Structure formats: structure tokens, C-alpha cells
Amino acid sequence: MASLVNNAYAALRTSKLELREVKNLANFRVGPPSSLSCNNFKKVSSSPITCKAVSLSPPSTIEGLNIAEDVSQLIGKTPMVYLNNVSKGSVANIAAKLESMEPCCSVKDRIGYSMIDDAEQKGVITPGKTTLVEPTSGNTGIGLAFIAAARGYKITLTMPASMSMERRVILKAFGAELVLTDPAKGMKGAVEKAEEILKKTPDSYMLQQFDNPANPKIHYETTGPEIWEDTKGKVDIFVAGIGTGGTISGVGRYLKERNPGVQVIGIEPTESNILSGGKPGPHKIQGLGAGFVPSNLDLGVMDEVIEVSSEEAVEMAKQLAMKEGLLVGISSGAAAAAAVRIGKRPENAGKLIAVVFPSFGERYLSSILFQSIREECENMKPE
């Protein structure tokens, strides 16, 4: 079902939505293209029915039907749900925004669309000609790859080898070329490799998710308004992980414009806590803690940064599946752990905390998140 109602996506709807005028009902064709069209079906006499060959091009879109014109129109308007069982001890209400329910199962679907669309509108990329190049921890790459596939772009992605196997498979399934980089170098190594590929690839363009204003812009125009609308403006605290900085910066700015009293709290891995004065380092919370401060991160919009360890994030992600029925990724576990910690503060009694769950758990089956379950399943024998 087409779910986008925000103005940011209005440009997607083109004149193709207008049903061409039907001058002769006998020639009107609906449904999948066919090689033959009978134009005398109205006749009831014994006269023979004559048929004519028609074009195999798709028929015009039928106006008024609740059908998305293409996959990009499925992005956004994700639901929110209260956390009831992992939030024991919290004096605040905690509601999660399930970005795991995007068409490609992560919040990065939004920026995959927005960055490609923005570059097209600026005339700097062309379908069938431009090769897109981008460093990714996986989810942004997937968000870019499915839009690139739908619009006819070649795409080359660089990714630390420490990211989950599911990410590799999904990216290849969308036709992306994937280059793995040294995991010890983190995202910085992936960025350096992408820049190297960019220089030697003709007609290539890097979308630069860490620096591209179209990243926080789409969250300001869509994710923020969605949270405000779904909470009817009653959100008191917004919690999100810090990766590219796009989600927390865009949503945080929108919410603070609507209500300056809204608190915006970011999350970073304890093992790579550069925003808290620490040093970059390896960690297990895929998608967070890039090891540097992205240009897209608006430090001024955040009221606080909370550290969550990889161990705590993994454990909470497991609890979300077992106790809430929400199969989400490790960064969602980190977000939930931080939200519950904030919710236990006495001063937050009765407040509403909105937290973003960035991705679906099925993308992490080969990771540490499900290691024990995976080993158990591998050792199962038929009875």
C-alpha cells in the first residue's frame, strides 16, 4: 500500500497517474500488457470477432487505486508502538518508531531515496550513465542499491568486512558491486576506499551520506513530522543512535522547532565514544559510532549523548524479540537500552519518549546477536 503522504515525496507522483481519455470502450485495456486486443467484444451478433495487435508497453496507471507507482512510494509513514515489557522500572512511556518496516527494512531507505532524488534534480547524475559510489556500514548501501536498481543506476559500495553476511547478500541481490575493507579501519577505511574507486571510475558520483544535506533534510521533512503527528505533539524526549548524524539532526531540529522543550538525546557505542571525549574503536553496534564526527551531525541540536556498550545493545535486542515480539537489529537494542535508562530517571515521570528502531533483525542472523541460537539450530537433528 502506498504510504507516503508527506510533501517531500509529492514530486514522485507524475502525469503518469492521469488516466488517458477513453474514447472507445471497445479499445480500453486494463491489466497486464497483452499481444492482442479484441475491439468488437460489445457485439452480440454472429459476426466474427476481429482482433488487432497492440503495443506491449505497460498500460496507463489507473487513477484512484491504492497502488504505489513504484517502490520509492512505499517509503515512510512507519508505525510507532509502546514498549511494555522491557521497560520495567521506567516511569516514562516509551514508544518505538519501527523503521524496520520500511520496504527494505531500515531507516536508511529514506536517505537512499532522498540523496539519489536530490542528485537527479540537480542534474549531476543520469540513469544508465552514472555509476554511484558510496561507503556504507550496510543499511545505507541497501537503501541506495534498491533505488539504484529501480532507476537504472550502476552502484559500487565499500563496506567494512565486519558487517553481517546478510548485508553482503542483499547488496549483491540488488546488483551492487561490493568491495570489502579492513574492519580494523572502521568506516574511515571504507570512506578512503570509496574515494579511491571514485577517482578511477569514469562518470562516477559519490553521494556522501556523512556530508550530504539531503540526509538530515529528509528526516526533517518526513521522520520528524511523522513522530510529531503520531504523538499528537506530546513527545517530550527523542532518542536516536548516532551514525551519519542524519536522523538525530533532522528529527531533532524539527521537533525543537515545534516545541523547544523537547529533549534530544543521542547514543554512541561505549567502545567508540568520541562524542563523549573518548577514542574511536571497534564495536558490535553496526551502524553507530563511525569513529569520526560527521558533517551532517548537528551537535547543537543534542541535549545529551548516552553511551551504550555492545554487550548491553545485543542483550536488549534479544529481549525485544523475546518479550515485545519485535525482531530488530543491534542498534535498535542500543536505542531501547538508552530509552529505558532515561525513562527510569525520576524527573521523566509521565513523559513520552520516542525512540527510533533503525532496522529489522533478520539482517543480523549471522551476527553476534543470534550466535547462540544459530549454533543451536545448526546442531538440531530430526526426531
UniProtKB/Swiss-Prot annotation:
Location of the protein in the cell: Plastid, Chloroplast stroma; Plastid, Chromoplast
Activity at various pH: Optimum pH is 7.5 to 8.5.
GO cellular component terms, semicolon-separated: chloroplast stroma; chromoplast; cytoplasm
GO terms (BP aspect): cysteine biosynthetic process from serine; double fertilization forming a zygote and endosperm; pollen tube growth
Catalytic activity: O-acetyl-L-serine + hydrogen sulfide = L-cysteine + acetate
Root EC class: transferase
Pathway per the UniProt entry: Amino-acid biosynthesis; L-cysteine biosynthesis; L-cysteine from L-serine: step 2/2
N6-(pyridoxal phosphate)lysine: residues carrying this PTM: K108
Keywords: Amino-acid biosynthesis, Chloroplast, Chromoplast, Cysteine biosynthesis, Plastid, Pyridoxal phosphate, Transferase, Transit peptide
Binding site for pyridoxal 5'-phosphate: N139, G243, T244, G245, G246, T247, S331
E.C. designation(s): 2.5.1.47
Transit peptide range per the UniProt entry: 1-52
InterPro entries: Cys_synth, Cys_Synth/Cystath_Beta-Synth, CysK, P-phosphate_BS, TrpB-like_PALP, TrpB-like_PALP_sf
GO MF term set: cysteine synthase activity
PROSITE patterns associated with the record: CYS_SYNTHASE
Main location: plastid
Cofactor(s) recorded in Swiss-Prot or TrEMBL: pyridoxal 5'-phosphate
Family, as annotated: Belongs to the cysteine synthase/cystathionine beta-synthase family.
UniProt subunit comment: Homodimer.
UniProt name for this protein: Cysteine synthase, chloroplastic/chromoplastic
Organism in which the protein naturally occurs: Spinacia oleracea
Gene, per the UniProt record: CYSK
